[in-house]
Amino acid sequence: MKISLTDSSKQRRLVVEGKLLAPRAAELRNACQEARVDLRGRELVIEMKHVTTISQEGENVILELINSGIRFRCQGVFTKHVVKELTRRASRNLGDTSR
């Protein structure tokens, strides 16, 4: 897995490439925490680019980041599908206040 950082005046983007597998999936969480430190009003976006595999731990990290308000941009059918399903799950969990 490779994570790179790009900055513009409106966005800070973390570009994730490769396989999002345990135990390295936690690196994405750590990279997001570090990237949030100095946003200066910019939006933090995670771009999933050429991601070929996502483990359960990887899905858990993505779901956690979605729940914290981070936006994802995805390339590829597989990655789009996984992030879309996790976004739906996050929306359902937010709507379920009975627990």
Regions found by a protein language model. Give the residues of each.
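STAS-like cytosolic regulatory interaction modules
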Residues: 1-99
